[in-house]
Amino acid sequence: MTTESGSDSESKPDQEAEPQEAAGPQGQAGAQPGPEPAGGNGSLNGEKQQPALEQFPEAAAHSTPVKREIGDKDRDFAAAAAKQLEYQQFEDDKLSQRSSSSKLSRSPLKIVKRPKSMQCKVTLLDGSEYGCDVDKRSRGQVLFDKVCEHLNLLEKDYFGLTYRDAENQKNWLDPAKEIKKQIRSGAWHFSFNVKFYPPDPAQLSEDITRYYLCLQLRDDIVSGRLPCSFVTLALLGSYTVQSELGDYDPDECGNDYISEFRFAPNHTKELEDKVIELHKSHRGMTPAEAEMHFLENAKKLSMYGVDLHHAKDSEGVEIMLGVCASGLLIYRDRLRINRFAWPKVLKISYKRNNFYIKIRPGEFEQFESTIGFKLPNHRAAKRLWKVCVEHHTFFRLLLPEAPPKKFLTLGSKFRYSGRTQAQTRRASALIDRPAPYFERSSSKRYTMSRSLDGASVSENHEIYMKDSVSAAEVGTGQYATTKGISQTNLITTVTPEKKAEEERVEEEDRRKKAEEATPVTALRHEGKTDSERTDTAADGETSATESDQEEDAEIKAQDLDKTQDELMKHQTNISELKRTFLETSTETALTNEWEKRLSTSPVRLAARQEDAPMIEPLVPEETKQSSGEKLMDGSEILSLLESARKPTEFIGGVSSTTQSWVQKLETKTEPVEAEVESTPHPQPLSTEKVLQETILVEERHVMSVHASGDASHTARDEVDAAESTPTDRRHTGKGKEGSSVTEAAKEQRGEEVDQSAPEQEQPATVSHEEEQASTIRTSEGLEQKSHFESSTVRVESTSVGSISPGGAKLEISTKEVPVVHTETKTITYESSQVDPGADLEPGVLMSAQTITSETTSTTTTTHITKTVKGGISETRIEKRIVITGDADIDHDQALAQAIKEAKEQHPDMSVTKVVVHKETEITPEDGED
């Protein structure tokens, strides 16, 4: 069977004339087989057409009439022409039936189906719903563009659409993939959410973008995903009210004008009162300004922009993996135990339900280390991997990485298909339109509080971590070797995407390199356990594509991005507001209630390391110490501690769970007042070494009154399991607010200071020196409700000291100071609430760990112990920070600053004890101090 091509059939009408005229009396015979082509293959063509006529009898009967004998020549010619036209119609029908693969030609009566459209419902950030119809075969980008057009949103790269799968897990809608392939069953219901939280919301171009970011953060706070203190809740709530309602008007605003708003998971009348009080102080602030202040405070929260995923480590311990702009965060028992900045991550991959992180080797390492985690199932592993790929691409790369184009590839082809943050910022700078008008909706939608997993409000303290039986073993497994990351490798949330920013960071790093070494040095010494040497074969994997030079510069300058000007600006902005906020709570009952709310507010996971040296945006008790203020005697120290000694009362349903935060305790030390001069000979009043120790011991809630003895024991017994001279602090004037000088205290205290900095004080102790050691102890909840049977204690102690040697750090030789005269004085201030019998019952030591990190100017030693006594689980984190300086340091100022820092970093605790130990060693050369 032969099928003629379309080009041959189309050329036949042009060739019909010549054969038809040349046929003459044989026109009928020539007409029947059809026209001959110019090549003279008429007979062959006729033979081919005859079987075709036999195979289609209906078409042949229709197109070929019965032959009739007509004598007239003209009628024969006309009949032949008519038959030729009918035959051409037959040829067209035959070609359409034989050559076409379309089913429509075979079934001309069948109705063509139009593409099916699907009804979509999108829940917006203000609680309203937006409905639209999209083609069933549309990609996710089509629906997302419709939603953004409805919202009049141009800076849309920070946002995305989410949907719930069959397991009720949140998934991000892939804009490059068809919607029907992502939602296999069920209705097409989506939620519009912020996908990438901008590290600096001030860089957003339009107010409408910041407004939707505020809506997302308010929902995060109400749902418990973004925990913050009671003070922060009140301040953010006041900005929310100012943004939506404007200035406070006593004529229009009644006592309950904000009762319809929802500010916190545990919304209370006390919170409303504080919000109203702060709202009155915002008079004249525009809605856009209020939202900017809201974002400036919210971005400093520890959980800002962190996407949490449940997982288990190699030992089967429940952890949480958080993905944010700066990298990967690892939480265990609400403690951030590790962080992997994007420059340190070499590759992320998954295989089945395992998720792997390959870490770039350090300066003194030869091989990469791979850490594996186990997720609930393979879908959760892939979901986490995709989130990591998108965050890394958006925040770190200048251009998105193209998916692999090979036909056969191993692993997933998924890559982030949107614009990066660098591209978004460039596009935002080109926006040229009037500021869009939009209505700021009310907060009536916040009627029910929910936690991350749908738990009730009383379980909000447990939403991030599940309490584990092995929670006491803080220093086990791979985290014992990698825990130094969280104390030294500080990461700023603003990651540079442009070469200019990178060059600026490198220049700043070179300028400050002489003052402090790279904080990542502790990373270099971390060992690799067997659990880290995991197979990296994965179903999906991606690699960081930055150059090594960029990564090294990024790591070295992580904690140098924030300048002193930014710190002072932040302190001025926040502290002034908090002072007016706190000055209103003058009554004792109100203060106790205030501290009670602080203790029961959602726990901050950490003082944001990425914003170091920024302090927590809100502190309940601000210690006003100017830069030149001094503590000349004990009365001023007592005044600092007076407001923090009130007992707190815990109300809630939280079981005993460790709530110590290593990274919060290890945020920063005082800036070095002066560099150490490398002078081998002592100069009077020219060289001085300052030892500032910050011992932070903290636990969270206390049980009942009968357990206050254990709590008081914790408050009194400062000495950790790693310390060798515990008797000094126990016997220096306990219960007295005066001074007691004992020779044993002098000698033991001197030895203790020496042990706190083993690599620095050997030459310093022999030389002439002045020691000032102070211990600030803060304890929370020494008086509790008797109906609690089990809880934990949070205790904080800070120690500040100074050593003034007659030479440089380690260059001093002992032959320069043959004789040392020592004068010692010890002053102890202690709260009368401490139980005198607290230290009689020993605790059972569950775990102990010591972490030491050192730079050119700072040595940090952290002792972490966990004990259980009397049904109370107590975690003690004692930190000593030794700062070396070369100037005439004001020791009283250093003490005041340490107290201030301790209260700023831990606002939910009260100071109960201060020990000032001053030891002056006089050499014959220097004379008496």
UniProtKB/Swiss-Prot annotation:
InterPro entries: Band4.1-L3_FERM_F1, Band_4.1_C, Band_41_domain, Ez/rad/moesin-like, FA, FERM/acyl-CoA-bd_prot_sf, FERM_2, FERM_central
GO molecular function annotations of the record: actin binding; cytoskeletal protein-membrane anchor activity; structural constituent of cytoskeleton
SMART domains given in the database record: B41, FA, FERM_C
Gene Ontology terms: biological process: apoptotic process; axon development; cortical actin cytoskeleton organization; cortical cytoskeleton organization; myelin maintenance; neuron projection morphogenesis; paranodal junction assembly; paranodal junction maintenance
Modification N-acetylmethionine occurs at: M1
Positions of post-translational Phosphoserine modification: S96, S428, S451, S486, S543, S547, S802, S804
Region of interest: Hydrophilic: 402-528
Subcellular location: Cytoplasm, Cytoskeleton; Cell membrane; Cytoplasm; Cell junction
Annotated region described as C-terminal (CTD), given as residue ranges: 777-929
Compositional bias of kind Low complexity: 20-33, 789-802
Expression across tissues: Detected in brain (at protein level). Highest expression in brain, lower in testis, adrenal gland, heart and kidney. Also present in muscle and epithelial cells. Isoform 1 is expressed in brain, isoform 2 is expressed in heart and isoform 3 is mostly expressed in kidney but also in heart and brain. Isoform 6 seems to be most abundant in kidney while isoform 4 and isoform 5 are predominantly expressed in heart and brain.
Modified residues (Phosphothreonine): T495, T518, T545, T725, T923
Keyword Cell membrane assigned: yes
Annotated stretches, region: Disordered: 1-72, 490-554, 608-630, 665-689, 705-807
Function: Tumor suppressor that inhibits cell proliferation and promotes apoptosis. Modulates the activity of protein arginine N-methyltransferases, including PRMT3 and PRMT5.
Subunit description: Interacts (via FERM domain) with CADM1. Interacts (via FERM domain) with PRMT3; the interaction is direct and inhibits the protein-arginine N-methyltransferase activity of PRMT3. Interacts with PRMT5. Interacts with PRMT6.
Miscellaneous section: The complete SAB domain is present only in the heart-specific isoforms (isoform 2 and isoform 5).
Name of the protein this chain belongs to: Band 4.1-like protein 3
Species, as recorded: Mus musculus (Mouse)
Taxonomic lineage from the root: Eukaryota, Metazoa, Chordata, Craniata, Vertebrata
